[in-house]
Each structure stands twice: as C-alpha cells, then as structure tokens.
C-alpha cells in the first residue's frame, strides 16, 4: 500500500481482529500523542526541538492551527501498568493519552522556542495533507477503569524531553 500511515492502520486492524477473535486476555490501547526522550525524529515534538536548535532566525510550523493534547511517556507507562495489573480490565478497547492542555502547533512551537531560550521567530506554514485539525482522545472509558492523576504537565515533560535531545543528538548551533 502506498497510502501514508498504512502500516500503522493495518497494525491497528490486525490488533483489533486478534482482540475480537481470540480468547487471549487482551487490552486494546489506542495510543494518542505520547512524547518524551528517545522517541525518534518522526514526531512533531522532537522535530520542533531539533529544528529550533538548528535555527538562527525562525522556526517553521506546519498545520499551525491544528490542536493536540500530549501525554508524557512516564504517565503513559504508569497508566499502562495500572491497566495490565487490574484483573477487571480485559477485552477492553481504551484510549491512552491526555485530554488536558490542548495546544495548537504554533503555540507548541513558541513554547519549545521559549524553553530553549532561543530568540527566533515562529512562522506558521500550510497544513499537512491528511492531518486532523484536532486530536484529543476521549478518556471516559479509561477513567471508569482506573483512577489516575497525571504527574507531568506539558511544560515539565517538554523540559525533560528537550534536555534529553540536547544531550543525545548532534545539532548545529
């Protein structure tokens, strides 16, 4: 398939088929905008960090008015552990992420630039084709299964993520 994100889509379909047609104790987690250290470069947060670190004049942000909620990896791992160790959770499909602190991509770019103490302008560009304008998961089912208080807000998680990328990636200054 040449459709962008087709392998991602097919893995979700396969996982749901396994979930529906097996007797295995399965929890189907739909992961939404998890971020943190070591996540590679093909996601918006590390990309904005890297491009901000390498820029002397400006940061270009695609889909500037599209909005997302982000969940720091430590919270995602803790939620997953709570679900896996809860014997009442079985044969469930649950969204995993955060529905707090919704932020536009342009504001995310400005926040990253601010946290990096860079004096560069943030410029909004065209929308990426196929990118949803808003991605905020419904966590109603998750909240009925477990009680979880998030430990990391967006700024705290970004500080940790930025620190890791600064120490572990080569970038020009």
Language model regions located:
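NAD(P)-dependent short-chain dehydrogenase/reductase
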Residues: 9, 13, 17-82, 109-113
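C-terminal substrate-binding subdomain of Rossmann-fold SDR/epimerase-dehydratase oxidoreductases
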Residues: 53-173
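Conserved catalytic loop/helix region of short-chain dehydrogenase/reductase
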Residues: 4-5
